Amino acid sequence: MPVETKTDESRQIAQYWDAIAPEFDAIYTGKKNFVSRGLDRLLRKDMYQRFEWVMRKADELRPATVCDVGCGSGRFVSSLAKRGTQVTGVDFAPQMLTLARQLTESEGVASRCKFELSDVLDWKTNESFDMVIAIGFWDYVADPLPRLQVIRKLTKQTFLSAWPRAGTMRMAIRKVRLKAAGCPVYFWERKQVENYLQQAGFRVQSCEILGQLYCFEAKSV
Protein backbone atom coordinates (compact mmCIF):
# COMPACT_ATOMS: atom_id res chain seq x y z
CA MET A 1 0.00 0.00 0.00
CA PRO A 2 1.52 3.36 -1.02
CA VAL A 3 1.98 6.19 1.41
CA GLU A 4 -0.53 8.90 0.60
CA THR A 5 0.44 12.58 0.44
CA LYS A 6 -2.93 14.24 0.17
CA THR A 7 -3.21 17.98 -0.20
CA ASP A 8 -5.89 19.78 1.80
CA GLU A 9 -8.08 19.93 -1.31
CA SER A 10 -7.72 16.26 -2.18
CA ARG A 11 -8.43 15.38 1.45
CA GLN A 12 -11.63 17.44 1.26
CA ILE A 13 -12.66 15.61 -1.89
CA ALA A 14 -11.91 12.17 -0.42
CA GLN A 15 -13.95 13.01 2.68
CA TYR A 16 -16.85 14.17 0.52
CA TRP A 17 -16.88 10.93 -1.49
CA ASP A 18 -16.54 8.80 1.62
CA ALA A 19 -19.59 10.51 3.08
CA ILE A 20 -21.81 10.07 0.01
CA ALA A 21 -20.54 6.71 -1.29
CA PRO A 22 -23.76 4.67 -0.80
CA GLU A 23 -25.92 7.55 -2.06
CA PHE A 24 -23.77 7.91 -5.19
CA ASP A 25 -23.79 4.18 -5.91
CA ALA A 26 -27.59 4.20 -5.76
CA ILE A 27 -27.57 6.20 -9.00
CA TYR A 28 -26.37 3.01 -10.71
CA THR A 29 -28.36 0.49 -8.66
CA GLY A 30 -31.64 2.43 -8.80
CA LYS A 31 -32.22 1.73 -5.11
CA LYS A 32 -34.13 4.97 -4.63
CA ASN A 33 -37.74 6.02 -4.57
CA PHE A 34 -39.61 6.44 -7.86
CA VAL A 35 -39.21 10.22 -7.98
CA SER A 36 -35.46 10.11 -7.29
CA ARG A 37 -34.94 7.46 -9.97
CA GLY A 38 -36.82 9.61 -12.45
CA LEU A 39 -34.75 12.67 -11.59
CA ASP A 40 -31.53 10.69 -12.02
CA ARG A 41 -32.61 9.51 -15.46
CA LEU A 42 -33.49 13.07 -16.43
CA LEU A 43 -30.70 15.11 -14.82
CA ARG A 44 -27.90 12.54 -14.82
CA LYS A 45 -28.54 10.96 -18.19
CA ASP A 46 -24.94 11.51 -19.26
CA MET A 47 -23.71 9.37 -16.36
CA TYR A 48 -25.43 6.39 -17.97
CA GLN A 49 -24.29 7.49 -21.43
CA ARG A 50 -20.64 7.68 -20.38
CA PHE A 51 -20.89 4.18 -18.91
CA GLU A 52 -22.31 2.85 -22.19
CA TRP A 53 -19.60 4.73 -24.13
CA VAL A 54 -16.78 3.11 -22.14
CA MET A 55 -18.30 -0.36 -22.52
CA ARG A 56 -18.77 0.15 -26.25
CA LYS A 57 -15.11 1.16 -26.60
CA ALA A 58 -14.03 -1.82 -24.51
CA ASP A 59 -16.06 -4.16 -26.72
CA GLU A 60 -14.44 -2.64 -29.82
CA LEU A 61 -10.86 -2.63 -28.53
CA ARG A 62 -10.96 -5.73 -26.29
CA PRO A 63 -8.18 -4.72 -23.87
CA ALA A 64 -6.70 -7.53 -21.78
CA THR A 65 -5.88 -5.14 -18.92
CA VAL A 66 -7.58 -1.94 -17.76
CA CYS A 67 -6.89 0.58 -15.01
CA ASP A 68 -9.85 2.63 -13.75
CA VAL A 69 -8.50 5.84 -12.22
CA GLY A 70 -10.99 7.19 -9.70
CA CYS A 71 -12.93 3.93 -9.80
CA GLY A 72 -15.41 4.90 -7.11
CA SER A 73 -17.86 2.14 -6.19
CA GLY A 74 -16.53 -0.17 -8.90
CA ARG A 75 -19.35 -0.15 -11.45
CA PHE A 76 -16.98 0.21 -14.41
CA VAL A 77 -14.49 -2.23 -12.88
CA SER A 78 -17.10 -4.95 -12.43
CA SER A 79 -18.60 -4.58 -15.91
CA LEU A 80 -15.17 -4.65 -17.55
CA ALA A 81 -14.19 -7.71 -15.53
CA LYS A 82 -17.34 -9.49 -16.74
CA ARG A 83 -15.88 -9.15 -20.23
CA GLY A 84 -12.86 -11.18 -19.15
CA THR A 85 -10.59 -8.19 -18.56
CA GLN A 86 -8.11 -7.94 -15.69
CA VAL A 87 -9.00 -4.65 -14.00
CA THR A 88 -7.24 -2.49 -11.42
CA GLY A 89 -9.25 0.22 -9.68
CA VAL A 90 -7.53 3.19 -8.03
CA ASP A 91 -9.34 5.57 -5.68
CA PHE A 92 -8.50 7.63 -2.61
CA ALA A 93 -11.90 7.30 -0.89
CA PRO A 94 -11.83 4.21 1.39
CA GLN A 95 -15.60 3.81 1.56
CA MET A 96 -15.83 3.78 -2.23
CA LEU A 97 -13.31 0.95 -2.39
CA THR A 98 -15.26 -0.97 0.26
CA LEU A 99 -18.32 -0.80 -2.00
CA ALA A 100 -16.22 -1.74 -5.04
CA ARG A 101 -14.83 -4.85 -3.36
CA GLN A 102 -18.31 -5.87 -2.20
CA LEU A 103 -19.66 -5.43 -5.73
CA THR A 104 -16.98 -7.47 -7.45
CA GLU A 105 -17.37 -10.24 -4.85
CA SER A 106 -21.15 -10.31 -5.25
CA GLU A 107 -20.90 -10.39 -9.05
CA GLY A 108 -18.33 -13.17 -9.10
CA VAL A 109 -15.49 -11.23 -10.73
CA ALA A 110 -13.25 -10.49 -7.73
CA SER A 111 -10.52 -12.80 -9.03
CA ARG A 112 -10.07 -10.49 -12.04
CA CYS A 113 -10.06 -7.28 -9.99
CA LYS A 114 -7.73 -5.54 -7.58
CA PHE A 115 -7.96 -2.19 -5.88
CA GLU A 116 -5.45 0.41 -4.71
CA LEU A 117 -6.23 3.06 -2.09
CA SER A 118 -4.32 6.05 -3.46
CA ASP A 119 -4.43 9.23 -5.44
CA VAL A 120 -3.05 8.19 -8.82
CA LEU A 121 -0.44 10.92 -8.39
CA ASP A 122 1.00 9.04 -5.39
CA TRP A 123 0.55 5.49 -6.66
CA LYS A 124 3.86 3.66 -6.92
CA THR A 125 3.63 0.93 -9.54
CA ASN A 126 5.60 -0.52 -12.42
CA GLU A 127 2.46 -1.78 -14.13
CA SER A 128 1.04 -0.55 -17.40
CA PHE A 129 -2.31 -1.31 -18.98
CA ASP A 130 -3.80 -1.76 -22.44
CA MET A 131 -6.49 0.76 -21.54
CA VAL A 132 -6.79 3.37 -18.81
CA ILE A 133 -10.06 5.15 -18.03
CA ALA A 134 -10.71 8.23 -15.88
CA ILE A 135 -14.45 8.90 -15.73
CA GLY A 136 -16.08 11.25 -13.22
CA PHE A 137 -12.56 12.21 -12.19
CA TRP A 138 -11.55 15.49 -13.82
CA ASP A 139 -14.46 17.31 -12.20
CA TYR A 140 -12.35 17.31 -9.02
CA VAL A 141 -8.85 18.06 -10.33
CA ALA A 142 -7.63 21.66 -10.37
CA ASP A 143 -4.47 20.97 -12.41
CA PRO A 144 -4.91 17.97 -14.75
CA LEU A 145 -1.43 17.84 -16.28
CA PRO A 146 0.53 16.11 -13.45
CA ARG A 147 -2.04 13.33 -13.20
CA LEU A 148 -2.28 13.01 -16.98
CA GLN A 149 1.48 12.56 -17.12
CA VAL A 150 1.24 9.74 -14.58
CA ILE A 151 -1.64 8.20 -16.53
CA ARG A 152 0.40 8.37 -19.73
CA LYS A 153 3.05 6.18 -18.08
CA LEU A 154 0.34 3.69 -17.14
CA THR A 155 -1.15 3.56 -20.65
CA LYS A 156 0.10 1.13 -23.29
CA GLN A 157 -2.53 1.95 -25.91
CA THR A 158 -5.81 3.72 -25.16
CA PHE A 159 -6.95 6.35 -22.66
CA LEU A 160 -10.64 7.17 -22.22
CA SER A 161 -11.65 10.22 -20.20
CA ALA A 162 -14.79 12.25 -19.52
CA TRP A 163 -14.61 15.95 -18.70
CA PRO A 164 -17.47 18.22 -17.52
CA ARG A 165 -18.07 20.96 -20.05
CA ALA A 166 -17.70 24.61 -19.09
CA GLY A 167 -20.56 26.97 -19.82
CA THR A 168 -23.48 24.60 -19.32
CA MET A 169 -26.48 25.27 -17.11
CA ARG A 170 -25.48 22.40 -14.86
CA MET A 171 -22.08 23.99 -14.25
CA ALA A 172 -23.52 26.82 -12.16
CA ILE A 173 -25.83 24.49 -10.25
CA ARG A 174 -23.06 22.01 -9.44
CA LYS A 175 -20.69 24.77 -8.34
CA VAL A 176 -23.20 26.05 -5.80
CA ARG A 177 -24.23 22.59 -4.59
CA LEU A 178 -20.72 21.20 -4.21
CA LYS A 179 -19.31 24.38 -2.68
CA ALA A 180 -21.98 24.09 0.01
CA ALA A 181 -20.85 20.49 0.56
CA GLY A 182 -17.20 21.55 0.84
CA CYS A 183 -16.12 19.86 -2.39
CA PRO A 184 -14.28 21.81 -5.13
CA VAL A 185 -15.44 21.20 -8.72
CA TYR A 186 -13.93 22.19 -12.08
CA PHE A 187 -15.16 22.52 -15.67
CA TRP A 188 -13.30 22.48 -18.97
CA GLU A 189 -13.25 23.84 -22.51
CA ARG A 190 -12.62 21.32 -25.28
CA LYS A 191 -9.43 23.02 -26.45
CA GLN A 192 -8.06 23.04 -22.90
CA VAL A 193 -8.51 19.29 -22.64
CA GLU A 194 -6.97 18.66 -26.06
CA ASN A 195 -3.92 20.71 -25.06
CA TYR A 196 -3.53 18.88 -21.75
CA LEU A 197 -3.75 15.49 -23.45
CA GLN A 198 -1.17 16.47 -26.06
CA GLN A 199 1.22 17.89 -23.44
CA ALA A 200 0.97 14.64 -21.49
CA GLY A 201 1.93 12.54 -24.51
CA PHE A 202 -1.40 11.47 -25.97
CA ARG A 203 -2.81 11.80 -29.47
CA VAL A 204 -6.53 12.63 -29.49
CA GLN A 205 -8.49 10.15 -31.60
CA SER A 206 -12.02 11.42 -31.03
CA CYS A 207 -14.20 13.60 -28.83
CA GLU A 208 -17.90 12.94 -28.32
CA ILE A 209 -20.28 15.27 -26.53
CA LEU A 210 -22.56 13.29 -24.24
CA GLY A 211 -24.91 15.65 -22.44
CA GLN A 212 -22.77 17.87 -20.22
CA LEU A 213 -19.56 15.92 -20.93
CA TYR A 214 -16.66 15.79 -23.37
CA CYS A 215 -15.68 12.14 -23.81
CA PHE A 216 -12.19 11.76 -25.27
CA GLU A 217 -10.51 8.71 -26.74
CA ALA A 218 -6.74 9.19 -26.94
CA LYS A 219 -3.76 7.01 -27.82
CA SER A 220 -0.29 6.90 -26.35
CA VAL A 221 2.25 8.58 -28.62
Residue ranges and their predicted role:
Residues K156-P164:
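Conserved beta-strand signature within the Rossmann-like core of class I S-adenosyl-L-methionine
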Residues D122-E127:
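Short conserved loop adjoining the S-adenosyl-L-methionine
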Residues P164-P184:
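Short, glycine-/aromatic-enriched active-site segment of Class I SAM-dependent methyltransferases
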Residues M131-A142:
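A short SAM/SAH-binding and catalytic strip from SAM-dependent methyltransferases
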Residues P2-E60:
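Conserved class I S-adenosyl-L-methionine
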Residues C67, S73-V120:
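Class I SAM-dependent methyltransferase SAM/SAH-binding core
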Residues V141-I151:
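A short, conserved alpha-helix within the catalytic core of class I
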Residues P184-A200:
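Short alpha-helix
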